[in-house]
Amino acid sequence: MKFKYHRWFQALVVPLVALAFHIFFGYRVIGRENIPEGGCVVCPNHVQLPAPPFAAVALGGKTPIRLMAKKELFRKKIFAWLIAALGAFPIDREGADITAIKTALGSVRAGQKLIIFPQGTRHAAEGETKKGAAMLAVKTRAPILPMYITEGKRFRCRATVVIGKPFTPDPKQKDYGLIADDILRRIYALKEQV
């Protein structure tokens, strides 16, 4: 079953979630001025806390946000409708998911912010990366926006998101692994600003 993205729903929900995050997590954002106009590939680290909503709220409710999410999250219809309406779309992490890649490319080219976790999973080590974010940035010639989310292992721990300066990888660089490593290095360099 296919579920739709509803920009109006996202614009309504994100500020409410931001308020809840401020109350329950002492949520704060550093570097919001670094968010570029137009489409970009947003690359946060993947943490135990609810990383996708933390990243989306950091971008604010005024910009269209899309998010690649593992297909397993779309198994329950009500939850699938909710996350799709908020901008998520499924990706099969086991193989080349052409539909997800086309959706991602189209989103960035349409001026939307695409959130993609370069580590692919919360269980990846700090140095492990996937190449998808690098490939999308090169193919769209869009800037990459590194983002660091503090790691918290318990409910109601203080949460901080640091948004780094955007950078655009060399479109001639075809070694996506090198770009992916650079993305991860830039993400974890933001840790010092917390």
Annotate the PLM regions.
Residues 28, 95-101:
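Glycine-rich, highly charged phosphate/nucleotide-binding loops
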Residues 33-35, 106:
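Short amphipathic alpha-helix with an adjacent loop that forms part of the alpha/beta core around
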Residues 1-31, 50, 77-86:
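A transmembrane-helix-recognition feature enriched in membrane-embedded lipid enzymes
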Residues 16-17, 85-90, 117-121:
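Short, basic, glycine/proline-bearing loop/turn elements
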Residues 1-8, 99-194:
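Non-catalytic C-terminal accessory region of glycerolipid acyltransferases
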Residues 36-95:
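Catalytic core of membrane glycerolipid acyltransferases/transacylases, capturing the structured
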Residues 20-22, 60, 82-83, 107, ...:
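A generic structural signal for well-ordered alpha-helical segments
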